[in-house]
């Protein structure tokens, strides 16, 4: 008995494999929808042996995963693995229902290899949400600041007030983060280590630390893959080679948090030899910054790992 779930902001498309048959239904991605999903599963006589699987995309899967975890085994899988499975199965078309069906099939075929999802601890969740909201506020402030440059006189004062309010909230969240670190010395030690990396500030340190503590990464390759910063080469047959690009199959929010640190590292010539080699090869600045983002992620992982092994 396997349940594949394709999660979006507003809906969850479900495919239940039971007794060799597929049963498909769409629900709202909210508590009412979760209850209707439970009723539907009970109608199909599901037991605690049901294995549920969804992709780790954004934040929209989290409430559902918490809910299902109370009753069933849940796996939250890296989208890259699902995509690789789809390629192997030669699935070319893409709809939400087909995605749910594919995830259910993946769950059935890989059942012995899948790891059960474990909800984050309270401190992991707190750090993650503080870091996430701090990023949200900073984005809002940046948007309003851009508007201010072109705003007419009768609108500018209102925008300035909004910016001041956002700045005040940002200061409050930063204070909460500092209080969190005081209450959790282990996190604080790791945070200080991360901030020794040129370009890594409070926000990016919090984002990297929350990701690192949340998932049991075995090596730096897994960590960069989780961030979607692992290189992927487009190749067709044995003779046609495309350009190498990052996979982008990973946590976009965390990847985004490394952009400004990469800009700072670039301006400070932290990786001058590395950057010069890329420039000689004719690489554009965007690709160079992405390469620096990956370097920062690797350095961060190794710093955190060495701290744990002390």
Identify the meaning behind each predicted range.
Residues 263, 301-302:
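Structural signal for membrane-spanning alpha-helices in multi-pass inner-membrane proteins
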Residues 1-17, 103:
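Gly/Thr-rich phosphate-binding beta-strand-loop-beta motif of the actin/hexokinase/Hsp70
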Residues 66-69, 75-193:
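Long, charge-rich intrinsically disordered scaffolds of nucleic-acid metabolism proteins
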Residues 49-60:
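Short glycine-rich phosphate-binding loop at a beta-alpha junction
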């Amino acid at each position: 008995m396997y349940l594949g779930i394709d999660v979006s902001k507003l809906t969850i498309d479900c495919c239940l494999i039971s007794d060799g048959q597929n049963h498909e239904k769409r629900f709202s991605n909210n508590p009412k929808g979760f209850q209707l999903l439970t009723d539907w599963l009970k109608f199909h006589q599901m037991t605690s042996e049901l294995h549920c699987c969804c992709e780790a995309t954004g934040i929209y899967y989290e409430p559902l995963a918490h809910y299902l975890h109370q009753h069933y085994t849940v796996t939250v899988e890296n989208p890259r693995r699902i995509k690789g499975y789809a390629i192997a199965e030669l699935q070319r078309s893409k709809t939400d229902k087909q995605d749910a069906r594919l995830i259910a099939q993946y769950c059935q075929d890989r059942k012995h290899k899948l790891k059960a999802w474990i909800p984050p601890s309270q401190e992991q969740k707190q750090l993650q949400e503080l870091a996430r909201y701090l990023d949200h506020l900073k984005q809002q402030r940046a948007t309003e600041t851009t508007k201010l440059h072109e705003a007419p006189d009768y609108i500018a004062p209102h925008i300035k007030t909004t910016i001041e309010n956002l700045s005040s909230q940002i200061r409050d969240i930063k204070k909460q983060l500092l209080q969190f670190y005081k209450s959790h010395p282990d996190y604080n030690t790791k945070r200080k280590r991360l901030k020794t990396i040129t370009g890594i500030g409070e926000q990016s340190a919090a984002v990297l630390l929350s990701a690192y503590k949340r998932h049991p990464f075995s090596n730096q390759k897994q960590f960069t893959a989780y961030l979607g910063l692992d290189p992927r080469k487009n190749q067709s047959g044995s003779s046609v080679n495309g350009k190498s690009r990052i996979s982008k199959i990973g946590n976009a929010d965390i990847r985004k948090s490394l952009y400004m640190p990469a800009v700072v590292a670039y301006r400070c010539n932290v990786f001058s030899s590395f950057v010069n080699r890329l420039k000689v090869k004719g690489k554009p600045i965007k690709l160079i910054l992405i390469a620096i983002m990956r370097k920062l992620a690797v350095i961060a992982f190794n710093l955190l790992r060495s701290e744990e092994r002390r």
